[in-house]
Amino acid sequence: MSKINKLEHIRNIGICAHIDAGKTTTTERILYYTGKSHKIGEVHEGGATMDWMEQEQERGITITSAATTCRWQDKIINIIDTPGHVDFTIEVERSLRVLDGAVAVFDGVAGVEPQSETVWRQADKYNVPRMCFVNKMDRMGADFYRCVEMLKDRLGAKPLVIQLPVGIEENFKGIIDLIKMKAVIWKDEALGAEYFEEDIPADMKDKAEEYRAKLLDMVVELDDHVMEKYLSGEEVTAEEIKRLIRKGTISAAFYPVLCGSAFKNKGVQPLLDAVVDFLPSPIDIGIVKGMEVSTGEEKDFPISVTEPFAALAFKIMNDPFVGSLTFIRIYSGKITSGTTVINTVKNKREKIGRMLLMHANNREDVKEASAGDIVALAGLKDTTTGDTLSDIDQQVILERMEFPEPVIELAVEPKSTADQEKMGLALSRLAAEDPSFRVSTDYETGQTVIKGMGELHLEIIIDRMRREFKVEANIGAPQVAYRETITKVCEIDYTHKKQSGGAGQFARVKIIFEPLKEVKDLKDEDKNKIFVFESKIIGGAVPKEYIPGVEKGLNNIRETGVIAGYPMIDFKATLVDGAFHDVDSSVLAFEIAAKAAFREGMPKGNPKLLEPIMQVEVITPDEYMGDIIGDLNSRRGQIQSMDPRGNAQVVTANIPLAEMFGYVNTLRSLSQGRAQFSMIFSHYDQVPSQVADIIKAKK
């Protein structure tokens, strides 16, 4: 197969969903039927191939996205299995950035759950074409049609139903293919490997006709010629329908909806056919955004084997046998082991050593990889998540990933001096793997503080520290990661002078600080940032080589705010004027001046304390509703909605994280263990003044 053709045959897909929707089981079945796995792994037995970290097998949840390659028909499918737990949304975000398409798995009983919404919005952000697989159709209470309605109501999506279930709950035995207008039935005893087509059951004919008509109404809109044919009463062929479904899926005009039961081995092969038929190849995506290093210009780069090499590092993982592995998605060109490339973000050269194709935790050495491939590189020295690897002669930086601020933190103290050294190494390795995990030192207490996206996230980090790095540590109680911001525009003109014999220091900076939400001409790429720096220096008042010193100084000093020492976020700093000295000025002098300007200027911006607000969803039987709402209100909660779901009620509320510690026990006692909740980070908001006073006093 020529390299150009090869691109058409690749599908880079992610499988993502809410925790427990059956995502890992679906991936396991895909690996089984594509011949990569000889024994089906069951998540609840701790044997799933994709869940290869010890903690994952114990907890039955997927934490890191394992990448794996398999084949179906004549296509190569690279699958990334992503975690569904809210504490690991960063893993999902990283995966979506490098995927061309996704399969969103939904629980046929629960429908669209909070984490499904989060993943869906993340996929929207990266314009990832996707299709939906309504799983667990064999379970009691499964309702395919309600799930389809929830896709419309909750996600605002346009579902295109291309399959209907045959039988419900324990009688679920197959699907109706609305393209071929045939029923596909699985033999129970053959582990799903044997299935056959038959005529649509008589009692489902009307329903199938109704949904077939809806399908045709939606797809013919994409092609005038086919629409004319359809309106004049001519038959639209299966080939034409497939072509239009593919066109509509790639352009996100609609999302094909399929159904099945991965656990019962039903519906997986048609899902694979749909991945191949409807999800895009790298060629369909066509371009990737980035910047040409030599000119600084933003450009669209074609995805092609013949272009110079460019790849994005999207994951770092420690492999017990190979050491550090960097997963990359190659967008253009090709590499062979032994080549030297450049990390354009860090401006460091990297030599490509071992190159591996991964199958969950098995690996296959390859000598060459090209555009469209997802491979793991062993032993890179300076590359971290989000960096670009590029051809040395034609350097590009691909669009970077933005990572969310951590919302929870806790102190860790090593139990012995030996643990102290090991802990430093362990934490820096774990932080390199996971950009949503941060490590810092509290300057007042000297304690090491770790920060993450939730209690489970930090629990697993600590667990890995113990298991993989053999570090014993004492763990403090979880703390809320407060932030600070300014609420009005302020300006500061600061001069830093130091003369004590020998070379002196001189730097003058004039900086305007303003809240991000008040910046009128904010660029699109700056809208999701927490700190924006801009220089408006004209006429060389501050030479170009000193300006990075100002940005670096501000970026460092904003980590310790002016109210209670929490990081300062959501503001823009504009350098508008300054002065320098031919001999005494330096990058360091401007860095010091910027820090002092921040310390003096920020208090004039009416600074406020911010706290993380979580979106909490509680599912409860009717009889406990009153008590639960009363309790949520007492936690400074704001109820957003109340909806019936089956014979339960779903309450959605925005609640400060500070009020949610230990909520699981309260909810258990309020509902006699019958209610459940999930929690997701929503936004940062100002802390009420009486609460802010208590927080400041504790500092």
From Swiss-Prot:
Residues 8-283 form the tr-type G domain. GO terms for molecular function: GTP binding; GTPase activity; translation elongation factor activity. SMART domains: EFG_C (SM00838), EFG_IV (SM00889). Keywords: Cytoplasm, Elongation factor, GTP-binding, Nucleotide-binding, Protein biosynthesis. The keyword Protease does not apply. The keyword Nucleotide-binding applies. CDD domains: EF-G, EFG_III, EFG_mtEFG1_IV, EFG_mtEFG_C, EFG_mtEFG_II. It is found in: Cytoplasm. Catalyzes the GTP-dependent ribosomal translocation step during translation elongation. During this step, the ribosome changes from the pre-translocational (PRE) to the post-translocational (POST) state as the newly formed A-site-bound peptidyl-tRNA and P-site-bound deacylated tRNA move to the P and E sites, respectively. Catalyzes the coordinated movement of the two tRNA molecules, the mRNA and conformational changes in the ribosome. Belongs to the TRAFAC class translation factor GTPase superfamily. Classic translation factor GTPase family. EF-G/EF-2 subfamily. This is Elongation factor G. It comes from Rickettsia peacockii (strain Rustic). The gene is fusA.
